[in-house]
Amino acid sequence: MNNRVGISGYSIMLGDEFFMREAISLARAAECLGEVPVGAVVVRAGEIVGRGFNSPIGESDPTAHAEIAALRDAARNLGNYRLPGCELFVTLEPCAMCAGAILHARIARVIYGARDPKTGVHGSVVDLFGVERLNHHT
């Protein structure tokens, strides 16, 4: 059975909406804390293995982005910083810092809810994920 559905030129997997809704829920938690509302989940084999939301203000940490928090949570839960076969669902297009972490973690697929014309590096400003010289592609 084909579990891909094409929408507006994009290919999505059935179930993607469920995981993006979880990321949106985490973004709302960030917003309630006065943070930029971004949430993220890491999924492996249809199961959420990591969750995170933006918290740089509350943690006084410029690296406390949703993607980084979700990657850290997944790495702890799986016992390895390398996360091949995992997918990342995030509400906003990743920035350069997060893209570097995503590449190092060897995430197989990144799904984001909205483009970020100021700092997005999955095509809005540049496309770091498309640079083959970055040697951590899965």
Language model: regions and residue ranges:
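Short, basic/aromatic recognition patches
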Residues: I12-L33
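Short beta-strand scaffold segments in enzyme catalytic cores
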Residues: V38-G46
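Zn2+-dependent cytidine deaminase-like catalytic core
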Residues: G50-T138
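Alpha-helical structural signal
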Residues: D16, M20, V38-G39, E67, ...
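Short, basic and Ser/Thr-rich N-terminal targeting/leader segments
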Residues: G34-V38, P84
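Small-residue (primarily alanine) positions within well-ordered alpha-helices
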Residues: A23, A27-A30, A40, G50, ...
